[in-house]
Amino acid sequence: MLSAFKLDNCRLSRLELDDSDDLTASIWVDLIEPEDDEREKVQTELGQSLATRPELEDIEASARFFEDEDGLHIHSFFFFEDADDHAGNSTVAFTIRDGRLYTLRERELPAFRLYRMRARNQTLVDGNAYELLLDLFETKIEQLADEIENIYSDLESLSRIIMEGRQGDEYDDALSTLAEQEDVGWKVRLCLMDTQRALNFLVRKARLPSGQLEQAREILRDIESLLPHNESLFQKVNFLMQAAMGFINIEQSRIIKIFSVVSVVFLPPTLVASSYGMNFEFMPELRWSFGYPGAIVLMILAGLAPYLYFKRKNWL
């Protein structure tokens, strides 16, 4: 999908791409999984070549932050959650050339959607491509900060469940959620660090206007303040994991102790029975017509009763 935006009194407005000359008035060209004809339209009208999928997936710094005859290029991770609430990072290719920002991505992203909503009423200060780029990065950092707050909130709820130590389905779900939160926290950290690298490259290599230079440094300070919070999340998750494993080990030791006591209690009767073999001359049950089926039923009950009891106690 191809979208283009122009400046109208320092505000972004979407261009209707019906006429062939529309792209030349744009300040921001946004492409999501572009078709071949959309790539050709950008190449023909603006003379801009776009990154390919292998180039988007390359993680080497030299392939993610560079400048050539086609402009200034930055490939940066953006955090998202899919329809199944699985977290991930998707690479967005930014290119700035001739005062125009190009963005190429594989999917719709929350930061872009939020920025487009804000841009309807937000006035740009300087109205240049660098300001658009930094505004998108700023929106991304706000989203990551919100995600860190959500993880903190979830960990508080999980902490109460785990520290109570009452194992069951809720406890198992808590451990599963804890592992998921660790994965989300790791992806947030990866996104923060990647954005930090991108901004450092932008500050060093690009000739930013003074307003955008200060904006970039402000975002870097925000990232520096968020990274320790993100690190504390891993410490909290690690503590809860160790606490959960400790409670599980204690519960397992208690169950093993009960099994050991039961085994010891029944060992002497078993020893006596095995020594004598129950070979007595006077055994009334031998002449009882229901002796055999009665013994079968008794054996079944003797095996079923402890099983049901252990199952009720969640020992099995």
Swiss-Prot record:
Which InterPro entries does UniProt cross-reference here? CorA_cytoplasmic_dom, CorA_MIT, CorA_TM1_TM2, Mg/Co-transport_prot_CorA, MgTranspt_CorA/ZnTranspt_ZntB
Q: Which reaction does it catalyse?
A: Mg(2+)(in) = Mg(2+)(out)
Write out the GO MF terms: cobalt ion transmembrane transporter activity; magnesium ion transmembrane transporter activity; nickel cation transmembrane transporter activity
Topology of the protein relative to the lipid bilayer: Multi-pass membrane protein
- For this protein, the parts annotated as crossing the membrane are 258-278, 290-310
Localization terms from the record: Cell inner membrane
Q: Which domain of life is it from?
A: Bacteria
Give a yes or no for keyword Metal-binding in this entry: no
Q: Which UniProt keywords apply?
A: Cell inner membrane, Cell membrane, Ion transport, Magnesium, Membrane, Transmembrane, Transmembrane helix, Transport
Q: Coordinates of motif Probable selectivity filter in the sequence? A: 277-279
**Main location class:** membrane
- How does the annotation summarize its subunit structure? Homopentamer. In the absence of Mg(2+), interactions between subunits are weakened, and dimers, trimers and tetramers can be observed in vitro.
Q: What is known of its domains?
A: The central ion permeation pathway is formed by the first transmembrane domain from each of the five subunits. Mg(2+) binding strengthens interactions between subunits and leads to the formation of a symmetrical homopentamer surrounding a closed ion permeation pathway. Low Mg(2+) concentrations trigger both a conformation change within each subunit and a loosening of the interactions between subunits. This results in an open ion conduction pathway. In addition, this results in a less symmetrical shape of the whole complex.
Similarity field: Belongs to the CorA metal ion transporter (MIT) (TC 1.A.35) family.
Q: Which NCBIfam families match?
A: corA
Q: How is this protein named in the record?
A: Magnesium transport protein CorA
Name the source organism.
Pectobacterium atrosepticum (strain SCRI 1043 / ATCC BAA-672)
